[in-house]
A protein has these predicted regions:
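Extracellular and organelle-lumenal recognition/adhesion modules and their flexible linkers in secreted
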Residues: 1-274, 279-290, 294, 302-347
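ATP-binding pocket architecture of kinase catalytic cores
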Residues: 297
């Protein structure tokens, strides 16, 4: 209920069928005809996220703002970012979403560093709107404003314009974390990690792994989010499948495998959130990676056999959360043979 909203907007609170408490923000007559966006929920730059410290390198130089919105009108939701340092406050960039036409617009002097996306829940009508900003250390502190903006075609507010908002979040990293309803304080959830032994499931070449993956992010939130990763393998014999990171947003999040030094990448998977992906190792050691019908070139692995103590970790690398996927995995399949190229071309 404690929204730090702008003046000229009234708010009423309700709870939806999923137990999300939300606010309806309605434009009053005293600001009708104005063009400036109005705050719903804000974190000022001087109270925001420090993008200069060690966390910048462990979590990546990103901050993410997100919330769920809906309206019967074509008003826009706006996510605005600002910086704060010794020079004071400076506007960085905006992400706009029109709530009926679903037009997405990114503006501002640092627009090239901003990525935004949205998802619509057809059952509830809620639109999940998220924006991720790649930060520069000289910015100091970064804050955000979650706002209502006027219909782009009209250009100004009308009395009675409204937007409903729930689950506002602002956090370090390149994706929003899970939101959990509690009876005490809000909490987030670390991604899950499970293991299974490689021994008795496979031994030597040939073999093929295939799995369905849904990512909760568009920009890599760590150096290399893992789908699977091996533990206790012999020297030079790791099993790795996941996503690579890049300083260039258009090349970030490519899928890859690394099997005994055979590192194969599929750049066509950059920016895709739902994939059927995997890797294949032929009897002669020739290894490829594949994702959504795209197959990489092959190179030869030095891997030869399974060590008895080796296990496969699903969803991350360590129990501390290092290189966790932050996504969903299903239908993990393994064959003790090399599937054909045609068989590798499943896709979501």
């Amino acid at each position: 209920d404690a929204w730090n909203k702008s003046g000229g907007i009234s708010v009423t609170s309700s709870t939806d069928e999923f137990e999300f408490k939300y606010g309806r923000f309605t434009v009053g007559s005293d600001i009708a005809g104005t063009t400036t966006g109005r705050n719903i929920c804000t974190v000022a730059g001087n109270k925001g996220i420090d993008v200069t410290g060690d966390d910048q390198y462990s979590k990546g130089p990103y901050v993410t703002a997100s919330f769920r919105v809906r309206s019967d009108l074509n008003v826009r939701a706006r996510i605005r970012f600002e910086r704060y340092n010794s020079e004071g406050y400076t506007f960085l960039c905006d992400a706009y979403l029109s709530l009926q036409t679903h037009e997405l617009q990114i503006t501002g002097g640092n627009a090239q560093l901003l990525t935004a996306n949205f998802e619509i829940d057809p059952g509830s009508g809620w639109i999940y709107f998220q924006a991720t900003l790649k930060c520069l250390p000289e910015w100091g502190m970064v804050g955000t404003q979650l706002q209502i903006a006027a219909d782009r075609a009209v250009g100004s507010f009308a009395t009675g314009d409204w937007i409903e908002v729930t689950t506002p979040q602002f956090e370090y990293g390149a994706c929003a974390t899970s939101f959990i309803i509690t009876t005490t304080e809000p909490a987030t959830r670390a991604s899950d990690l499970c293991k299974f032994p490689l021994m008795k499931n496979m031994y030597t070449m040939p073999f093929t792994f295939m799995v369905e993956v849904h990512k909760n992010w568009f920009i890599s939130h760590n150096a290399a989010p893992r789908v699977i990763d091996s533990e206790n393998h012999q020297s030079g014999g790791p099993f790795i499948m996941g996503f690579g990171s890049s300083g260039t947003i258009s090349q970030d999040g490519y899928s890859y495998c690394d099997i005994g030094g055979a590192n194969r990448r599929v750049y066509e998977s950059c920016g895709v959130r739902d994939l059927v992906m995997g890797f294949r190792v032929k009897a002669d050691g020739m290894t490829c990676s594949f994702a959504n019908k795209h197959i990489s070139t092959e190179t030869k692995t030095v891997w030869k056999y399974i060590r008895e103590a080796a296990v496969i970790r699903i969803g991350g690398q360590t129990t501390t959360g290092l290189r966790h996927l932050n996504g969903h995995i299903k239908n993990l399949r393994f064959w003790n043979r090399a599937l054909s190229d045609t068989q590798l071309k499943e896709y979501v």
